[in-house]
């Protein structure tokens, strides 16, 4: 790490922002946060999914990781495919399941690569077609 606590992992820009807290930037397109606790980690959002954020998490910690989506928007949940299980608000569950298909994934990632913010570091030839069924656990308001 340099004096800004920034490093690259698989093209993602990772910055240590506090003790055990990392900001993970997915190619200038999406931002996620990883909080590492004593017995497990928490990943807030999974980004677009153009890159393998799970591999980045594994590079930063060996602890089991709980994954939570802020909402169902693909820029927050496109990387869910890299995990077996995620948590989201109960109203987002149906949408998350519906958008986990090849057509939605490919179209969304291709649109993101055309954005001005995209830094050109993603190689999506292998990742754009990756699809994995994951379990979505509903969270109700007031339960966390």
Description of each model-found segment:
Residues 50-143:
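Active-site HxH/HxHxD metal-binding segment of metal-dependent hydrolases
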Residues 1-14, 118-125:
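Short, basic/low-complexity N-terminal boundary segments at the transition from targeting/disordered tails
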Residues 2-7, 21-26, 126-129, 135-137:
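Short, solvent-exposed secondary-structure boundary motifs
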Residues 7-59:
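Conserved beta-strand hairpin/beta-sheet module of binuclear metal-dependent hydrolase folds
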Residues 22, 143-144:
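Short beta-strand segments in beta-sandwich/barrel cores
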């Amino acid at each position: 790490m340099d004096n800004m606590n920034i490093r690259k992992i698989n093209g993602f820009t990772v910055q240590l922002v506090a003790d055990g807290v990392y900001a993970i930037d997915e190619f200038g397109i999406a931002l996620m946060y990883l909080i590492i606790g004593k017995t497990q980690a928490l990943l807030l959002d999974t980004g677009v999914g153009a890159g393998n954020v799970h591999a980045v998490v594994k590079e930063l910690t060996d602890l089991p990781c709980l994954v939570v989506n802020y909402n169902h928007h693909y820029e927050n949940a496109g990387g869910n495919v890299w995990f077996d299980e995620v948590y989201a608000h109960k109203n987002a569950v149906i949408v998350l399941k519906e958008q986990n298909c090849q057509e939605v994934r490919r179209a969304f990632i291709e649109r993101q690569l055309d954005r001005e913010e995209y830094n050109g570091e993603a190689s999506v030839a292998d990742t754009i077609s990756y699809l994995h069924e994951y379990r979505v656990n509903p969270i109700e308001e007031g339960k966390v």
